Amino acid sequence: MPFVHVELIEGRTEEQLTNMVKDITEAVSKNAGAPKENIHVIVNELKKDRYAQGGEWKK
């Protein structure tokens, strides 16, 4: 039962997220031999003002 965690900066459309989840599920199923119904994809969207790189807030 594979679990895939994805963290992204917010801003993608529902359609983009849906397509991404479908593509990830397909890739894991193909390469890990797992049935699609057993693959879990968890998407966490980070607020743009809650992301830092190199010690500096990204805005």
Curated annotation (Swiss-Prot):
InterPro entries: 4-OT, 4-OT-like_dom, Tautomerase/MIF_sf
Active site: P2 (proton acceptor)
Magnesium in keyword set: no
EC annotation from Swiss-Prot or TrEMBL: 5.3.2.-
Enzyme class of the recorded protein, top EC level: isomerase
GO molecular function: isomerase activity
Keyword Isomerase on entry: yes
Keywords on record: Isomerase
Domain of life: Bacteria
The family this protein is said to belong to: Belongs to the 4-oxalocrotonate tautomerase family.
Protein name (database record): Probable tautomerase EF_2859
